[in-house]
From Swiss-Prot:
Description of the deletion phenotype: ATG16L2-deficient mice are viable and born at Mendelian proportions. Deficient mice exhibit intact canonical autophagy.
WD repeats: 338-377, 382-421, 424-458, 459-502, 504-543, 550-589, 593-623
Official protein name in the record: Protein Atg16l2
More about this protein: Although ATG16L2 is structurally similar to ATG16L1 and is likewise able to form a complex with the autophagy proteins ATG5 and ATG12, overexpression and knockdown studies suggest that ATG16L2 is not essential for canonical autophagy.
Composition bias, Basic and acidic residues: 64-79
Gene3D superfamilies to which the protein is assigned, alphabetical: YVTN repeat-like/Quinoprotein amine dehydrogenase (2.130.10.10)
GO biological process, one term: macroautophagy
Pfam families: ATG16, WD40
GO CC list: Atg12-Atg5-Atg16 complex; cytosol; nucleoplasm; phagophore assembly site membrane
Gene coding for it: Atg16l2
Family: Belongs to the WD repeat ATG16 family.
Taxonomic source organism: Mus musculus (Mouse)
């Protein structure tokens, strides 16, 4: 049945019917659209939310999900309960829609709560995850750094291992070389020892042969002298008080002979001795001994002249000034800074016009004493160490010095370089002195030995072992005297192997000085005293002390005046002290330019000048 307004003629064209259907649809749309206009978009929106919530609900667990799904299914059953054949009214639909809306709102609220809760948990987990990622990144960076450090350490270890291997190879090579060199050194030492033994044996044989020849010559000389004395004893000789006068009133003819090795005596002294009255046999023995010396000198002189080649003139020593009475110095005439450092030694030559000083700067300066001034003469170089002692030979042509380089050295005046080195000591040489001949010398050292030297061959002819350091030595005719650190003075016979006498003193001995008549010995020691020893009775005769006098070091030197009337020494305060030997009292003390301790003093043979040296480079000439 056609609807209202439909065409009655079935043969009407199809377009008319189409228009009619469209009009009917539009009419139904206008009448029914208003009822579902709000429901359909809300439902579509709800479906979209449901799909979104379904995605979130998949992440949630059982109970909320089951409750929501159950409610949703119940709602669907309720909705589906109205069959397709049933037609609901708009009011019922609106009621259902509101109920469904409330249910959906409840579901949405629950879902929103779950979403918020899960979102908070998710944020917490994300923050923890970020923290762990940060820690992981830091640990990864630390791991990278450790790996780099490990790689660097591995490279360094490999380099060190390579260096150790190279050093081990070098060490093994050096060890092999050292073994070879030690073997070579032992061979060389054995060869040197053999050569030294051969040399010592050869020198010992030569010395024995020389001693034998000397003994034969001495015996021959003694035989000649005894024959001459026997001939002289057969004649009658009367001694008168007038010199050079015989019994018959005629004057004896005097022959002036001056052997090279005999000292000169002044005419006044000779006459004075001959004018003394003849009182005992001692005078006769003294006269006979002098006669023997004169005869021996004549024989030696003739023998030297006979063995000389081409008639060359015999070398003679210069005349030595004889001191009749020494003058006590009163003032400083000249002051010089002679050395670069401390001055340790000073010595006058035999003619009193030449002076030698030695110091720690390894130099020996020679000075001329002219007009109360010191004029530089020469500098002797080549010393191997600090100079501790200087000495002139009896002719004044050679200088002997002790040094800290375990040796003594010999210079010839006029030559700047050392002529000979006497080596053999094992420690510092503290003293070196000529004997009464220029061809022999004696040295003392801190190695507890005293050595005698043959200067002609630079050969040690004798070594004396002592129990203490030797600080100074002096020489007599046939005796050697040494002062030691153990407060003892020892006497050695140069013709025998053993010590013949020991004199103990208080304090370490710093210096010794023998008077020119060889009858008295002056010693200086660290107990701040000077002692005079009478060698005839081997006993201490006098002890000199003074307020303010203090021995400053183990090498402080003290000396006799040439006439043995005074004793002179320098103190640590720079003053010079002079004692009268006859009275034993302090004669005077000289205060002068010395600002430091005085190390050594020297009194010239003429007795006119005194020289002192100190630790502050100064050399002072006193008059």
């Amino acid at each position: 049945m056609a609807g209202p307004g439909a065409p009655c003629d079935p043969c009407a064209p199809a377009a008319v019917w189409k228009r009619h259907i469209v009009r009917q649809l539009r009419h139904r749309d206008r009448t029914q659209k208003a009822l579902f206009l709000e429901l359909v978009p809300a439902y579509n929106h709800l479906l979209e939310k449901a799909e979104l919530l379904a995605k979130f609900s998949e992440k949630l667990k059982s109970e909320p999900k089951d409750a929501i799904s159950t409610r949703h299914e119940d709602w669907r059953e309720e909705v589906s309960g109205t069959g397709p054949d049933q037609v609901s009214s708009p009011a019922s639909l609106r009621v259902k829609w509101q109920q469904e809306k409330k249910g959906l709102q409840l579901v949405c609220g629950e879902m929103a709560y779950q979403v918020v809760k899960k979102s908070a948990a998710l944020d917490t987990l994300q923050s923890q995850l970020e923290e762990r990622q940060d820690r992981l990144e830091a640990l990864q960076a630390c791991v990278v750094q450790l790996q780099e450090a490990r790689a660097q350490q591995s490279r360094q270890l490999e380099e060190r291992q390579a260096e150790n291997a190279a050093q081990r190879e070098a060490y093994e090579t050096l060890l092999q070389q050292a073994v070879h060199q030690e073997a070579a050194l032992r061979r060389l030492q054995e060869e040197a020892r053999d050569l030294l033994e051969q040399l010592v044996q050869r020198k010992a044989r030569a010395a024995a042969e020389r001693n034998l020849r000397n003994e034969r010559r001495e015996r021959a000389n003694q035989a000649l002298v005894s024959q001459e004395l026997k001939k002289a004893a057969k004649r009658t000789v009367s001694i008168s008080e007038i010199p050079n006068t015989l019994e018959d009133g005629t004057k004896e003819e005097t022959v002036a002979l001056a052997p090279a090795a005999l000292p000169e005596f002044s005419e006044s002294e000779t006459c004075e001795k001959w004018k003394r009255p003849f009182r005992s046999a001692s005078a006769t023995s003294l006269t006979l001994s002098r006669c023997v010396d004169v005869v021996k000198g004549l024989l030696d002189f003739k023998k030297r002249r006979g063995h000389s080649v081409g008639g060359a003139p015999e070398q003679r020593y210069q005349s030595i000034p004889v001191c009749v009475s020494a003058q006590i110095p009163s003032q400083a005439q000249d002051v010089l800074d002679a050395h670069l450092s401390e001055v340790n030694a000073v010595c006058f030559g035999p003619n009193s016009s030449l002076l030698a000083t030695g110091g720690a700067d390894r130099l020996i300066h020679l000075w001329n004493v002219v007009g109360g001034r010191l004029e530089a003469n020469q500098t002797l170089e080549g010393a191997g160490g600090s100079i501790t002692s200087v000495d002139f030979d009896p002719s004044g042509s050679q200088v002997l010095a002790a040094t800290y380089n375990q040796a003594a050295q010999l210079w010839k005046v006029g030559e700047t370089q050392s002529k000979e080195t006497l080596s053999g000591h094992k420690d510092k040489v503290t003293a070196a002195k000529f004997k009464l001949t220029r061809h022999q010398a004696v040295t003392g050292s801190r190695d507890r030995t005293v050595k005698e030297w043959d200067l002609g061959r630079a050969y040690c002819s004798r070594t004396i072992n002592v129990l203490s350091y030797c600080n100074d030595v002096v020489c007599g005719d046939h005796i050697i005297i040494s002062g030691h650190n153990d407060q003892k003075i020892r006497f050695w016979d140069s013709r025998g192997p053993h010590c013949i006498q020991v004199i103990p003193v208080q304090g370490r001995v710093t210096s010794l000085h023998l008077s020119y008549d060889q009858l008295h010995l002056l010693s200086c020691s660290r107990d701040n005293t000077l002692k005079v020893i009478d060698l005839r009775i081997s006993n201490i005769r006098q002890v000199f002390r003074a307020d303010g006098f203090k021995c400053s070091s183990d090498w402080t030197k003290a000396v006799f005046s040439p006439d043995r009337s005074y004793a002179l020494a320098g103190s640590s305060n720079g003053d010079l002290y002079i004692w009268d030997v006859n009275t034993g009292k302090l004669e005077t003390s000289l205060q002068g330019p010395h600002c430091t301790a005085v190390n050594a003093v020297a009194w010239c043979f003429s007795g006119n000048h005194v020289v002192s040296v100190d630790q502050g480079r100064k050399v002072v000439l006193w008059h």
